């Protein structure tokens, strides 16, 4: 067993589909390591608190040695109190006929108060991952409403796209996913994202030597970008288990570090690297050491890549301008 003090992990939307796939894995130590006890602090909207109690009963019935305690609330000031990690999963899904502005406005009503609550009561070193879509811009809303925290503490999940990109390439090349290194997802977690294979390797060989350029540009990129829609079409519901798994991967790498010589994709505040407008929450290739991420520098950007990277940046700028107009950020 462990002598480590428990850390506090806040999860919003905890009674939802992704929450249900996520909480048991956090309790089992998949996210922060098999020697790190956790206190789960679960936030839900008032009507979902009863369902959340059922999830808590199951968490307790799992008798997880690492699960030190579970707190539930419909108040972010309770759920985020002293949180070391916060996974913001709960969001307003897009409904038929909704314009992007409507969706951003509805989510602003969630992420603005959550940013303010994190600012008020979370640990000063809290690591925040926004999973709820539109994740990049929801992360920006939360971040801009938490002025006392370092902007770099707010990240958005592009790891699901990253994992999808790995698995599609593995399938195409007939190699195990473990053979694939250094794929990058640039930009927004949306259909404008750019899954970039220009630096990727498969078993040490350049990925683009192993696949056809036409397949890469015309099939691979759209397949990865539209995978979420394909899952809804097939399953009748959005991806939940794979999203939870990606959230675990993102937080584990942020907390425990990336492997030597490898990078992963994280949605993080741009510092202007690669000509991406500063301040946007944008997918970049990063390495992590001692809980701090760094953008991988010095990668060659082709004309094709530049066009894709700029297009997804433009979409994020439009979303930022929209939330500014709505008064969600200044």
From Swiss-Prot:
Instruction: Name the gene that codes for it.
Output: mdh
Recorded protein name is: Malate dehydrogenase
Where on this chain does NAD(+) bind? 13-19, 107, 114, 131-133
Family, similarity comment: Belongs to the LDH/MDH superfamily. MDH type 2 family.
The record lists the lineage as:
Bacteria, Thermotogati, Deinococcota, Deinococci, Deinococcales
Q: Which organism is it from?
A: Deinococcus deserti (strain DSM 17065 / CIP 109153 / LMG 22923 / VCD115)
User: What keywords would UniProt list here?
Assistant: NAD, Oxidoreductase, Tricarboxylic acid cycle
Q: Which InterPro entries match?
A: L-lactate/malate_DH, Lactate/malate_DH_C, Lactate/malate_DH_N, Lactate_DH/Glyco_Ohase_4_C, Malate_DH_type2, NAD(P)-bd_dom_sf
Write down the EC number.
1.1.1.37
Catalytic function, reaction form: (S)-malate + NAD(+) = oxaloacetate + NADH + H(+)
List of residues binding substrate: 94, 100, 133, 164
